[in-house]
Amino acid sequence: MANVQMLKDAILGGEYDLRFKRVYVTEEAVKAQHQRYVGLANDFAEIFSADREVRLFSAPGRTEVGGNHTDHNHGRVLAAGINLDAIAVASKNDENIVRVKSRGYKMDVCDITDLEIKEDEKGHSPALVRGMCAGFLKYGYKIGGFDAVTMSSVLSGSGLSSSAAYEVLVGTMLNYLYNDGQVDAVTIAKIAQYAENVYFDKPCGLMDQMACSVGGFVTIDFNNPSEPVVEEVKFDFASSGHSLCIVDTKGSHSDLTDDYAAIRSEMESVASCFGKSVLREVDEEEFRSKIPAVRKKVGDRAVLRAMHFFADNARVLKEVEALRNGDFETFKSYILESGDSSYKYNQNVFSVKKPLEQPVSLALALSEELLKGKGAWRVHGGGFAGTIQAFVPNDILAD
């Protein structure tokens, strides 16, 4: 443990470079992190104290690579942590107060002796702090007060799961400040989903939190959501000759909770036609044989979204197999199929509330013009706004 000056000296002296390299990959990126972390340490000294013992923390954003909107209906996903992350400099306190000052935002202050759900906090970051603390206790772990400064390169509303990265960051601080690092990544993800569902009041699945918490390239099967099956997918992406690009369309996710919730509720409305709670429990052949009756009961869009679920859920297995076989061209074809399904069937490329605003649609159209026959592109994550995902051949990346 070190005070702020000792921490800064260690960062600038290269003592963290091996750990930075695991997260940020290139030497150039590692050097850029020196000033980023030192700047955050200076923030801590200015806001709290330069003399307290402090520690560094990081939680990545995520990109969903396969299985678009399948997790909340207990499906499969293929996801990856990315090197855009939320970071923190933090120190324990003995006040039972959590203070988190995120750069550019006002300080969140949470009295953790009161972990009741607060209606006025729903949709705001204090709810995530309170929810993470409540979740740690619910799972039998320790909590305590701490002071932290944070900053994030995972832009809010970008489709890279800024809220999940923030939740996992708070969970990681609680884990190492009060639980000696004994809380595993899967449990932190479950607690993060609990915080977002119950305290933040957003009905998300578990994929975002799991990818942010576990990191790397992972496939996750949520058939039993209390015990999701997480498997690493080993693939040398550098050998593919492509770069994974996340393209910001400048649209925001901040106004779209109802659109996201409708996807889950409509999929579940189809499941209810078969006496089930989620689509993973429904037999696909039975569903297809009864489409006329189902569409009369729950509507055409719900049927289309169910069709997307079944196809994209099965497609994840094909994507994983292609990667493990080193067949990147086949993998790209599945990426294109997934994007087409999201656009036509899941219909999460633009909001029907704002039909004149279609930045994701435009970005996908331009990507097709530029990358057809060369790369792959798709909407990812929640959709409707934010970012798209593109696999771009390195030889045309600069163009």
At which residue positions do the language-model features occur?
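Structural signature of FAD isoalloxazine-binding scaffolds in flavoprotein oxidoreductases
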Residues: 76-94, 214
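DPxDG-like acidic metal-binding loop motif
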Residues: 81-83, 160-180, 392
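C-terminal nucleotide
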Residues: 1-62, 87, 91-122, 219-378, ...
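Alpha/beta catalytic cores of group-transfer enzymes, especially the acyltransferase/condensing modules
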Residues: 180-229, 338, 364-367, 379
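Glycine- and acidic-rich phosphate- and metal-coordinating loops
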Residues: 133-156
